[in-house]
């Protein structure tokens, strides 16, 4: 199953995609201003072009697991994305610490946002490995 992971932010949306077997997570180019109509269209076009079967959106919960203003904004954006990409399922997944892990990777070939999306996708794939196989 090919999965697209998104690390949403109002300025940029980090993107990563899995291989068809759901084994590898690869960061790809980020999308600027994803909250705009044009940004949502670009995300939807990316999902279709990559032929993904699921989209995973990082949910930025507070350290104690509570919702923050960014959590609420992300939920609203994911709802808009869900409408735009139907019937592709859109799932929210806890993204705590993904940006910190991505920052430590030191890889400068892709944006930190897309590296964070790849960490998110690796976590999601590991949790769902038996469902994908």
Could you tell me what each predicted segment is?
Residues 1-6, 10-133:
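Phosphate- and other anionic-substrate recognition elements at nucleic-acid/protein interfaces
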